[in-house]
């Protein structure tokens, strides 16, 4: 016991950095930056104002880190069971729950202060809503309550491009909501493919993920159905004249490949299809948003 107390009293800076899930935060900030860039009127404005670029992403990143730290606290028992997470700071006892919560509160307050001071109130309150949606609604309740947890809770994870857009414009509009809808539709096939691959771990931790509660066949069908929805939603930026032909062609090609993987997973026609579908889903989302950016700034490139 003395050793545990000593370890709690001497966490390192790396432990606190790990609490923020830095890789996840970086991905969120990339989508936030994309939202900012898409909200900037190319080619007239060209780029994001430096104040919003730096402080907007700093505030969003701090709040995202706070939500991640709360997730570590709530999931510490689950993390200690699962192979992928059993070495996390709270699971191993390197940081105490009270210390992690205090750290999360500090990050959240700092993030909100930065957003209120350097962006606009709407960005700050939407960021707070996203933080609470992930930390309280998803992690604290939905994750253990329903196999549809990732569908409902996916809205919080889909928020960063909206936050980046609103940091520039100061108001809501159809375009950033469509970006949220794309990530919202992408989340179930992305995450359920991973859940199939790690089904036994989730069952051991008593988390009601869809493959655990309804079986792999049912989950694979829903991955296919959600991928069809995603394919349709991904074409909407072209339909509402948010993007042009370059994006449309990329969305069609990327979506067709995603459907190919979802079908292969459903039919069990390729080895390791679940984890390969999961990995492709990450590539898909990255390239889709890059296509939006290229299409957005293409007129600027043509004028140079």
UniProtKB/Swiss-Prot annotation:
Membrane association type: Multi-pass membrane protein
Taxonomy, superkingdom: Bacteria
One Gene Ontology cellular component: plasma membrane
Catalytic activity annotation: heme b + (2E,6E)-farnesyl diphosphate + H2O = Fe(II)-heme o + diphosphate
A biological-process GO annotation: heme O biosynthetic process
Miscellaneous: Carbon 2 of the heme B porphyrin ring is defined according to the Fischer nomenclature.
Species of the source: Pseudomonas paraeruginosa (strain DSM 24068 / PA7) (Pseudomonas aeruginosa (strain PA7))
EC number of the protein: 2.5.1.141
Name this protein carries in UniProt: Protoheme IX farnesyltransferase 1
Membrane spanning residue stretches: 24-44, 47-67, 99-119, 122-142, 150-170, 176-196, 228-248, 280-300
Pathway per the UniProt entry: Porphyrin-containing compound metabolism; heme O biosynthesis; heme O from protoheme: step 1/1
Pfam family of the protein (one): UbiA
Keyword vocabulary terms for this entry: Cell inner membrane, Cell membrane, Heme biosynthesis, Membrane, Transferase, Transmembrane, Transmembrane helix
Subcellular localization, as worded in the UniProt entry: Cell inner membrane
CDD domains given in the database record: PT_UbiA_Cox10 (cd13957)
Free-text function comment from the UniProt entry: Converts heme B (protoheme IX) to heme O by substitution of the vinyl group on carbon 2 of heme B porphyrin ring with a hydroxyethyl farnesyl side group.
Family named by the database record: Belongs to the UbiA prenyltransferase family. Protoheme IX farnesyltransferase subfamily.
GO molecular function: protoheme IX farnesyltransferase activity
